[in-house]
Amino acid sequence: MKYWWAWLLLALSLSGEWMLLRMWLQKKEYSRYDRIIIQAAETYSLDPSLIKAVIWKESQFDTFATGKAGEIGLMQLTDAAAFEWADAAKITTFEPAHLYDPTTNTLAGAYYLAKMRRGFTQCDNPIPYALASYNAGKSQVLRWRDGSGTTNATTFIQQIGFPSTKQYVQAILRQQPKFKADFE
């Protein structure tokens, strides 16, 4: 017990190094798909940090993630959304299993997110509306738009009727600035 403070310093030092290693590995994992994200962002005129934040929230960068309603891959796409992308991209050989491919999934997800954003161009900031549509569907978003929430994104976020969708939108909007530096 004479050197308890030395053991304490050693333990603190090792835990600090573990935290640094964990942060480095996480950053490396989060950057793994940056090239694909940039390609999708350029193709569909989206901010790459937004796409990356959606991937972070939807799948935590797990290409094999599957959702409760059958959503697949990095951006957690449904078959219907993916087939819509494939039709628009004139891909005749598309199959839902292709959604496990990071490039295919990210391109399809970016297409769908850009489509959602285009539906709200009259708003001061269409991104929260697009994210809510991506998560809960456009019909839900149209129900939540009321009064000043029709065009004011801050008011709209407060009017989102599903707590999980409100948290989803807020989490992505908080995370997006953290990913900005990855694309500068």
Task: Place the predicted regions along the sequence by residue.
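Catalytic and substrate-binding regions of cell-wall glycan-acting enzymes that process beta-1,4-linked
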Residues: Y129-E184
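N-terminal Sec-pathway targeting helices
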Residues: M1-L20
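Short glycine/serine- and small hydrophobic-enriched flexible loop segments
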Residues: W56, Y111-R118
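Alpha-helical scaffolds flanking conserved acidic
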Residues: D47-K52, N125-A132
